[in-house]
Amino acid sequence: MQRYPLAVEQAFPPEPVFLLTAAMQDVVREGTGQALKSYLPPEITVAGKTGTTDEQRDAWFAGFSGDRLAVVWVGYDDNRAARLSGSAAALPIWGDLMAALTPEPLALARPERIEMVSIDPQSGLRGGSSCPGARELPFMQGSAPSDRAPCSGPMDAAVDAVNQAVGETTKRAKTFLERLFGR
């Protein structure tokens, strides 16, 4: 590959790529891919997705780190059911492979138009420190739920207002500095 020059061209806007990658990191952190914790050290962050086709004919895991990408498929080439799931069959193979390759951690820079919003997992509405289990999740600016979860209190709304004001001030300062010094 090193003999053939690669021309890297961005094909998609950074915001949807960030959102999809964040969701795939959650699969590994707390979903069907969480068994990877036993293969990789905690500082190696990865993103991935398990898969199992109808009637368990195929099992797969596709994932990537900061510098590696691999897809593992487990199944029969005559279309017989393997009777295995992606997390049980393909994920361990992927985990062994990545552990042997010692990948770089996946580190994503959050695009400017992505905001982190506290969400109550029970209702899917805006949460806050008053909501047990509330998580910061990424959203395109302006697309986060505006309704508040029943568990969120008046202090959570005040914190949101302060964070929004600080964000607007930071944007204005950045715009001013860009005009002053150029990009």
Identify the residue ranges that each predicted region occupies:
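Low-complexity, Gly/Ser/Thr/Pro-rich intrinsically disordered linker/tail segments
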Residues: 117-182
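A penicillin-recognizing enzyme superfamily signal
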Residues: 1-138
